[in-house]
Amino acid sequence: MIAVTINFNSIAKITDDQFYQLCRENPDVKFERNAKGEIIVMPPTGGETGNYNSEINADFVIWNRQTQLGICFDSSTCFKLPSGANRSPDVSWIEKSRWDALTPEQKQKFPPIAPDFVLELMSPTDSLKDTQDKMQEYMNNQVKLGWLINRKTRRVEIYRQGQEIEVLECPTELSGEDVLPGFVLNLKTLWQ
């Protein structure tokens, strides 16, 4: 199954509160919204991708519990980006002082903040171009570091704020650099 994009703009402009309500009233459907206001219905992942997402998230949570530098999120969290888009990265992380600057209401709904770090793990049905466009959208919204992991091609694209995309072929690990100090993601099991 692939993602489906629906454009309601000629009929009605969906407000932030309406989009939030749409998501709340349809908890079994994962929605995103691009900067043009189009609604994207995201398909569920298969078992393998879901397992790898879970394992990767666990690595981030363990690191973050040890360092207490920020807040980790999984793909069920939708962020309101500065461009107006609503996106749900597979893994994301926000530095603690930035998260603490949000109001309780902002934290409760779709936080109006771009994460410092995002990770997208492609599933077999994901479009590479659409996922690359999403990664570029994150960078355009001031995300500092992003990893696009493509298990099919055994390739990782590293996105850094203000820099060219770096492409790695079958890396065994990724460093969180200065954004995620001391974090290293082991990728050996991902390529098996």
Can you say where each PLM-predicted feature lies in the sequence?
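Gly/Pro/Ser/Thr-rich low-complexity, intrinsically disordered segments predominantly at protein N-termini
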Residues: 1-192
